[in-house]
Amino acid sequence: MNLFAEATFQNGRNTLPQNVAAVAAQHRLEVLDAEAIREARALAVGLIGDGVASAQCLICLQSHFGAAIFGLRQEGALTGLLAAFPLNAEGFQALEQGAFDAVALDTALVARPGEEPAAYYGWAFAATNHDGGRAVMMASVDIHRLLYWAVPTYARAVTADGSRALQRIGFRPHATQAGLFVIAPALAAGVRT
């Protein structure tokens, strides 16, 4: 698959989960199944603390979009987690109005495969080591840069380290919501705003 050609065809509004999986795979992240999602949630709770969506919520999201929760394994151990997904127009509106609940996610707000996204949401970034953190962040950057550059991309920081990491890769604080960060849409693939 030529990811740049596919990204150009999709005009920065990717509708295909397999494209997200292909970009994540370039950074050694794999789409997680239900068992691995439970493991990834435990990793996130251990690193971030309470306030992480339930395993069932994560599994429902993966079933809904197909490629939203990824993990990096090193020597068999899960060392990195990336969870991100496209929002439909209703989800984008809820996010902008401060009504988006990331812990008790309503999958009706998430774009389905084939549905044009109104925004993209970075839901969880967690890693147990430097290599895991780097893979997760670089996959996140490339997913945005190649597939979702024409829509706003959001993430919420729950730790000071998370806030710094988001700002290093181009996120800026949201104008009205504390803790929410955004990358504005670009005019073309690979262009930063």
What do these predicted ranges mean?
Residues 2-24, 142-157, 164:
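Non-catalytic interaction/Regulatory regions outside core domains
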Residues 5-65, 69-78:
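Short amphipathic alpha-helix that is part of the acyltransferase structural core
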Residues 68-73, 81-83, 100-105:
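Long amphipathic alpha-helical scaffold regions
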Residues 76-81, 120:
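Glycine-rich phosphate/pyrophosphate-binding loop shared by adenosine-nucleotide-utilizing enzymes
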Residues 81-96:
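Short, solvent-exposed beta-strand-terminating loops
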Residues 82-86, 149-193:
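Active-site/acyl-donor-binding loops of N-acyltransferases
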Residues 95-170:
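Acyl-donor binding region in acyl/amide transferases
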